[in-house]
């Protein structure tokens, strides 16, 4: 890159690389700060998987960064079960779409994005921050840059631990994502992987802080037996195909998303550096990619005489994204709180509510289309292939 960068992106994760590619497509010069890649241990493979909606898929496909079919399994149906007889079913055919979402293998997606960045002449990968008109902080929820800027990260800690692993099921998953809410507030999600007729699953089991150590200490067979019971034999038995990972759950939002450095230049937050939500709705990465898309859009549509770090642009980005993140955060928080209450009348009410919601086709369709990113969030790429429409 002969000329100095206009934008410095701190953090080369999925959101950071996506933003770099979006800006590069608009001929914006980008410096992408990346740490030296770590080699995963063969004994402890990366078990992360994300549910990506149609808007996120369209965005990544426009950047030629969508993984192969084997690493992006379509979800044709989603079944959500309450702690009694409550049940909600979403079906792709009813929504007239190919899939409700895709369960994507994180290492495969990261590899696709890294390859796209390597072939982008507008993006220079650097090992330390450089001066630019705009610095975008995409360092994740533990961002050191955000902390150094004095930005308050308002955290609500849930009394839950997420346990993640890869599984092999006794029966094919059929492209169905299944989720159970228990009377104790636990949320069990079994996400299909390995193709539409595969048996591989991504497990995300959000359990109470006191129960998590017990489950993690179990031998593999005993853990799978508990899992089989919690999933009501929906897929028969399970075999662990990876180590188990665990982390505490939280919802958080930064009190400021944009500002200026004392020495000059603007900064803005994106992705988990700006916000996190409970994983029960599977929307965390979709929100981060929508951040990247919106920031790229306001930069693309700016008046020719405005800098990429213009305060008006960054306020426009923050207003748009805060509203979307707040709505999703409140929705996931409300669901978590609703099922965390063990009061019997409330249990009957929430299960009755699930049944009523399942019968309300208009409301269910509206919720489904929002979750797919078809009602708000990420815009589709423009017909010219430049930017977002």
Annotate each PLM feature.
Residues 2-13:
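Beta1/beta-strand and adjacent pyrophosphate-binding region of the FAD-binding site
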Residues 2-3, 58-62, 71-148, 154-164:
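Conserved N-terminal helical subregion
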Residues 10, 24-47:
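Glycine-rich FAD pyrophosphate-binding loop
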Residues 16-17:
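N-terminal Rossmann-fold NAD(P) dinucleotide-binding loop
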Residues 46-70:
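N-terminal glycine-rich dinucleotide-binding loop that anchors FAD/FMN and/or NAD(P) in oxidoreductases
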Residues 60, 134-246, 253, 258:
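Conserved FAD-binding catalytic core of PHBH/FMO-like flavoproteins
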Residues 211-309:
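FAD/FMN-dependent oxidoreductases across multiple families
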Residues 297-389:
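C-terminal helical "tail/cap" subdomain of flavin- and related membrane-associated enzymes
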């Amino acid at each position: 890159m002969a000329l100095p960068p206009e934008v410095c992106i701190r953090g080369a994760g999925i959101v950071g690389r996506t933003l770099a590619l979006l800006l590069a497509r608009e001929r914006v010069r980008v410096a992408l700060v990346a740490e030296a890649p770590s080699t995963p241990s063969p004994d402890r493979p990366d078990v992360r998987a994300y549910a990506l909606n149609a808007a996120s898929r369209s965005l990544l496909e426009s950047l030629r960064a969508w993984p192969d079919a084997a690493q992006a399994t379509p979800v044709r149906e989603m079944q959500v079960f309450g702690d009694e007889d409550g049940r909600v079913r979403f079906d792709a055919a009813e929504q007239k779409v190919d899939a409700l979402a895709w369960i994507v293998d994180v290492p495969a997606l990261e590899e696709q994005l890294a390859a796209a960045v390597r072939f982008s002449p507008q993006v220079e990968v650097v090992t330390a921050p450089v001066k630019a008109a705009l610095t975008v902080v995409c360092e994740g929820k533990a961002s050191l840059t955000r902390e150094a800027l004095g930005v308050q990260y308002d955290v609500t800690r849930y009394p839950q631990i997420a346990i993640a692993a890869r599984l092999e099921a006794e029966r094919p998953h059929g492209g169905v994502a299944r989720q159970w809410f228990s009377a104790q507030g636990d949320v069990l999600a079994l996400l299909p992987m390995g193709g539409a007729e595969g048996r591989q699953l991504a497990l995300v089991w959000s359990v109470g802080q006191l129960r998590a150590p017990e489950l993690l200490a179990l031998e593999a067979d005993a853990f799978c037996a508990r899992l089989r019971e919690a999933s009501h034999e929906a897929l028969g038995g399970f075999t662990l195909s990876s180590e188990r990972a665990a982390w505490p759950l939280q919802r958080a939002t930064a009190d400021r998303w944009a500002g200026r450095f004392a020495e000059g230049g603007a900064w803005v937050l994106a992705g988990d550096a700006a916000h996190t939500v409970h994983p029960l709705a599977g929307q965390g990465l979709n929100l981060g990619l929508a951040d990247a898309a919106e920031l790229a859009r306001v930069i693309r549509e700016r008046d020719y005489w405005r800098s990429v770090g213009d305060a008006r642009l960054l306020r426009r980005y923050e207003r748009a994204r805060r509203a979307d993140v707040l709505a999703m955060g409140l929705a996931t928080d409300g669901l978590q709180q609703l099922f965390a209450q063990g009061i019997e009348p409330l249990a009957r009410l929430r299960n009755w509510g699930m049944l009523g919601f399942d019968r309300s086709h208009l409301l269910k369709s509206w919720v489904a289309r929002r979750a797919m990113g078809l009602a708000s969030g990420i815009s589709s790429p423009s017909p010219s292939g430049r930017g977002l429409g």
